Design a protein with these regions (language model features):
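Active-site-adjacent beta-strand/loop module that shapes the phosphate/pyrophosphate-binding cleft
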Residues: 75-100
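A generic structural micro-feature
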Residues: 7-11, 82-88, 104-107
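Short connector loops at helix/strand junctions that flank enzyme active sites
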Residues: 12, 20, 38, 65, ...
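Conserved Nudix-box catalytic region and its N-terminal flanking loop in Nudix hydrolases
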Residues: 21-59
Length: 141
């Protein structure tokens, strides 16, 4: 590849949470999108991944979550709206409590997907599917 093919705005560092309740995984999606992803968001300078995950859930869903064990790192490169993107996802266990998880943002929505249906639900990147499917037996909230 040429240097121009690697031009990116930067590699994004993102904290993501795996929250399983009743055999279902909490996911987030842009409204109208056929794909979904684990909830979370960008880590700001000076934050830990756990702090960023808790902050993002407060901002996006208005809830306080408990972050748990570190589950892994997922690299992801993709095209979006004609632009190259690259991200490093730090994935943590997350407990969102017993209440409903509703977006405070007008462009995203939260939902629950059965652990056996992560592929059909369009969970991306695909590496999240293995982490999510493994989650049910290991740390259901």
């Amino acid at each position: 590849m040429t240097a121009g093919e690697y031009e990116l705005a930067g590699i994004e560092t993102i904290a993501r949470g795996i929250c399983v309740r009743g055999g279902r995984l909490l996911v987030c999606r842009a409204k109208g999108s056929a794909t979904c992803y684990l909830p979370g968001g960008h880590i700001e300078f000076g934050e830990t991944g756990r702090e960023a995950l808790a902050r993002e859930m407060r901002e996006e869903a208005g809830i306080d979550v408990r972050t748990g064990a570190f589950r892994g790192v997922v690299e992801n490169s993709f095209m979006q709206h004609g632009a190259k993107h690259a991200e490093i996802n730090l994935v943590y266990e997350m407990d969102a409590g017993e209440g409903e998880v509703v977006s405070k943002e007008d462009w995203i929505e939260f939902g629950w997907v059965g652990l056996g249906e992560l592929g059909e639900a369009g969970l991306l990147p695909e590496a999240f599917r293995a982490l999510g499917a493994d989650a049910g037996a290991r740390f259901e909230a």
